[in-house]
């Protein structure tokens, strides 16, 4: 009996598939990252899109006296705490885009996955990725731009060593919260620490996610740039109550989908294309200079030969 006759005796796979339903995933976007900075920052709501940071002028000159001994009659010093007359104000910045969806597509092809919902989901994910990039690299309000000269140090020998990170911790020694660096920076530090016989501990956070740590401070990878084989390590203290770094957002937006994020339907044009405006308002404030420090010119291309 020929193979053709065998095939004709039963329904074939190709024909049978025409009656079967396939399980379909939602669209997968490879540029989505964990965005640890957005998770680890403390977020503060602001009014009218403005956040004013009031600082004390010459804090070391505030005079307080401790009594030297019993019966001392030395005069009590007079003092007052002066404030900056022109404090820095942070204004929320917007990240926006228009999403176009043909009504025919959303009407006919929204099962099992809603086309409008998926278009907006992927757009919002991309906007949040851009938000994190700006929080680190923006020349106006990014972490790297707000680190002062006194809070920026150089590596001892190019590659990031435990001594380098210890020196960075001395700059943000009041309850530091976390490090930020590029994945290549994490790998470079792991090599140097292991080569010196002190491999960095690994802890589990946010479920199964593994983080390299140093002195208990987390090292999540992030959008810190790498240029010419060099990157940076950023150390941050977070929170208003700790005079640290805080993220800023505007609450109560029209069409709010998440803190500081709104989606608004703007209409349908003559080509039957529906348009949605997606906008995120964000910024980042450093309350005191010692809440942020940067290890600069970190080489990520140095390797060791183990014998």
UniProtKB/Swiss-Prot annotation:
Pfam families: SrpI-like. The keyword Glycoprotein does not apply. It comes from the Bacteria. Signal peptide: none annotated. SUPFAM superfamilies: Major capsid protein gp5 (SSF56563). The keyword Oxidoreductase does not apply. One of its GO terms (cellular component) is encapsulin nanocompartment. Disulfide bonds: none annotated. It is found in: Encapsulin nanocompartment. Keywords: Encapsulin nanocompartment. Has 4 domains; an N-terminal arm not found in the type 1 subfamily, a discontinuous peripheral domain (P), an elongated loop (E) and the discontinuous axial domain (A). Belongs to the encapsulin family. Family 2A subfamily. Dominant antigen for this bacteria, could possibly used in vaccine formulation and/or for diagnosis. Homooligomeric. The encapsulin nanocompartment is formed by 60 subunits; monomers form pentamers which assemble to form shells. There are 12 charged pores where the pentamers meet as well as 3-fold axis channels and dimer channels. This is Type 2A encapsulin shell protein. It comes from Mycobacterium avium.
């Amino acid at each position: 009996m020929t193979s053709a006759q065998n095939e004709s005796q039963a329904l074939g796979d190709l024909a049978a598939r025409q009656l079967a339903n396939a399980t379909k995933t939602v669209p997968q976007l490879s540029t989505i990252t964990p965005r640890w900075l957005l998770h680890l920052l403390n977020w503060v709501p602001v009014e009218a899109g403005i956040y004013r940071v009031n600082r004390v002028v010459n804090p070391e000159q505030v005079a307080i006296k401790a009594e030297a001994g019993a019966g001392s009659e030395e005069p009590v010093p007079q003092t007052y705490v002066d404030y900056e007359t022109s404090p820095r104000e942070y204004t929320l910045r917007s990240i926006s885009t228009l999403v176009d969806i043909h009504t025919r597509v959303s009407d006919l092809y929204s099962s099992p996955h809603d086309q409008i919902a998926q278009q907006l989901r992927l757009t919002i994910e991309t906007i949040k990725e851009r938000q994190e990039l700006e929080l680190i690299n923006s020349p106006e309000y990014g972490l790297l731009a707000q680190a002062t000269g006194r809070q920026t140090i150089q590596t001892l020998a190019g590659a990031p060593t435990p001594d380098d990170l210890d020196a960075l911790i001395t700059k943000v020694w009041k309850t530091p919260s976390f490090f930020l660096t590029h994945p290549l920076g994490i790998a470079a530090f792991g090599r140097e620490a292991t080569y010196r016989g002190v491999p960095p501990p690994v802890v589990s956070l946010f479920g199964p996610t593994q983080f390299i740590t140093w002195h208990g401070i987390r090292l999540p990878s992030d959008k810190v740039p790498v240029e010419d084989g060099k990157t940076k390590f950023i150390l941050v203290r977070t929170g208003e109550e700790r005079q640290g770094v805080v993220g800023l957002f505007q609450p109560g937006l029209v069409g709010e989908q998440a803190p500081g994020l709104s989606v608004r339907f703007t209409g349908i044009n003559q080509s039957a294309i529906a348009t949605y405006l997606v906008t995120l308002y964000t910024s980042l404030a450093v309350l005191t200079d010692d809440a942020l420090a940067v290890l600069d010119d970190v080489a990520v291309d140095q390797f060791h030969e183990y014998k």
